[in-house]
Amino acid sequence: MLEKRLENRIALVTGASSGIGEATALALAEAGAKVAIAARRRDRLDDLAERLKPLGAEPLVLEADLLDEHAAQRIVADTETHYGRLDILVNNAGVMYLEPVAEADLGRWRKMLELNVLSLIASTQAALGGMRARRDGHIVNIASVAGRVANPNSAAYAATKFGVVAFSEALRREVYQDRVRVSVIEPGLVATELRDHIGHAAVKDAINAWAQSLRELQPEDVAEAILFCVTRPPHVAINELLLRPTDQER
């Protein structure tokens, strides 16, 4: 039987309707946590909730469009109201629009900036009050290897992920004395629906061909990395975790 290392801990996972978020919600539940799940697609959340219930997660389903900063803050308040507190916030919601700068759709890029960065900041801000007051809490921000290496056609996406990495480090230095831990996770290529967002046909075809040429990470691989971070003893903080497929160079 899996050790319940997160028994009596309360977690909120955004972008939980698929991919890394879905796998993370299940991993946290298997480790004993109570789990709130947030995303736009209610049907997917309801399906996930049915799988979480047998694990004892007592799931709270939060349908929300996190492009709205008030919704990003409200899901935190709703989690705290429902369970009494929030111990672990996993900011996973995001999109990936890849295209050359000269052909960029700035409206699409603005949406990506708002979801990948500003929404994450809004949820984090909402969670800090309770965590600092209790001197206990963990913020996990999902960035990307694109937050370390900026490649052609990924200018805006990389900018958002570099932003998440920088925000996470600055936040860590603001809250470490309150015993609030901050971890930023930087996955390489993962087999998720994220590439479906790419609107530039040639770039999308190239990325998909590249993905087929190697053994991609699975969402469960990233969820396991997140679980590792949030199950360390209180005196240990994993500030940054970079993971790539073995076959991925850049």
Which residues make up each language-model segment?
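Conserved glycine-rich Rossmann-like NAD(P)H-binding loop of the short-chain dehydrogenase/reductase
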Residues: 33-48
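The beta1-alpha1 cofactor-binding region of Rossmann-like NAD(H)/NADP(H)-dependent oxidoreductases
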Residues: 43, 63-74, 106
